[in-house]
Amino acid sequence: MGSKETPDLKIILEFGAGAELLFGNIKKRQLSLNGAQKWTIAELLKWMHANILTERAELFIQGDTVRPGILVLINDTDWELLGELEYELQPNDNVLFISTLHGG
């Protein structure tokens, strides 16, 4: 048994249609998350809120989930088909958040 550390979980976060404005106006981020723990979308949202959400959290987070009007695609698939908050992130997953909320 080697004493190798668990490799980080590398994923890509993308933000579109205005969602990036809540995250320092950065549209794409590559993350290396602690590979020793299981990462679900619920855990990812908590991490995002604590670490990279810079503006008006209420426009992105509502309770433990994203607020209505934020679309979440995981590898181009609607997260509703993948279990939403329960989805377990896999290496090289691409998670895209799109805001459908636009001011008038």
UniProtKB/Swiss-Prot annotation:
Keywords: Cytoplasm, Isopeptide bond, tRNA processing, Ubl conjugation pathway. C-terminal thiocarboxylation occurs in 2 steps, it is first acyl-adenylated (-COAMP) via the hesA/moeB/thiF part of the MOCS3 homolog, then thiocarboxylated (-COSH) via the rhodanese domain of the MOCS3 homolog. There is a cross-link at residue 104 (Glycyl lysine isopeptide (Gly-Lys) (interchain with K-? in acceptor proteins)). The keyword Cytoplasm applies. It is found in: Cytoplasm. SUPFAM superfamilies: MoaD/ThiS. GO terms for biological process: negative regulation of JNK cascade; protein urmylation; tRNA thio-modification; tRNA wobble uridine modification. Disulfide bonds: none annotated. Its main location: cytoplasm. It comes from the Eukaryota. Pathway: tRNA modification; 5-methoxycarbonylmethyl-2-thiouridine-tRNA biosynthesis. GO terms for cellular component: cytosol. The modification 1-thioglycine is found at residue 104. The keyword RNA-binding does not apply. InterPro entries: Beta-grasp_dom_sf, Mopterin_synth/thiamin_S_b, Urm1. Interacts with cer. Acts as a sulfur carrier required for 2-thiolation of mcm(5)S(2)U at tRNA wobble positions of cytosolic tRNA(Lys), tRNA(Glu) and tRNA(Gln). Serves as sulfur donor in tRNA 2-thiolation reaction by being thiocarboxylated (-COSH) at its C-terminus by MOCS3. The sulfur is then transferred to tRNA to form 2-thiolation of mcm(5)S(2)U. Also acts as a ubiquitin-like protein (UBL) that is covalently conjugated via an isopeptide bond to lysine residues of target proteins such as Prx2/Jafrac1, Ciao1, Eip71CD and GILT1. Belongs to the URM1 family. This is Ubiquitin-related modifier 1 homolog. The gene is Urm1.
